[in-house]
Amino acid sequence: MANVVTEPTARTKAAARTRDAVKIYGKGQTEVRALDGVTVEFEAGRYTAIMGPSGSGKSTLLHCVAGLDTLTSGSAFVGDVDLSTLDDQRLTILRRDRIGFVFQAFNLVPTISAAKNITLPLLLAGRKGDQAWISKVIEITGIGDRLEHRPSELSGGQQQRVAVARALASRPEIIFADEPTGNLDSRSGTEMLTFLRRAVDEMHQTIVMVTHDPVAASYADRIVFLADGRIVDEMQKPTAERVLERMKRFGE
């Protein structure tokens, strides 16, 4: 199956992109080609979902373009920075200063309050942060009445709100979210997706989210579909029904 090359129009700036991205795990008979020549651009100020069957390369693509893993060949860029040109220290600084992350696991520091968890990346970077921006983040995520509570005193949904607020607090150029609703019940998951949607619409953030859930994907502006490590399709202005119908075709 040939790769579908997905690029924005000439007027659209890419917040992140890959070019002919290949990721191979193992060698010989155990070799797995997780990414097979993927070229894709993630547009600034938009919400993109990545979907595909299990083992299609969704999380591998996200991890490589976010600088959490390295490509076997090809290129990955955040803005105009080629990640392959950075040593470990510079890559760490880029992730800290320019990227926000939201994972299925909340990854909060258990011994400090929600408020301190939200601003911890700024503290580690030696930055004060924009207080007006942080206040807006707290408003959007609806965590204002729980700021002095430690993670153990919060529900799963509340902990994920704190994790999203932490990702937004540093005003990153792009946020990568890997199955962010995976550990949440239906109500908390819907709230989380609404927060991410508002972050794009009201705060002009850029979000790239891996998900297997058609309802979650319907919150995005665009969906990129992977199969066998290749981009096989994309969808603009998705609905849950259209996404579900498209996903069914992967089983044919």
Predicted regions and their residues:
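ABC family nucleotide-binding domain
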Residues: 13-220, 226
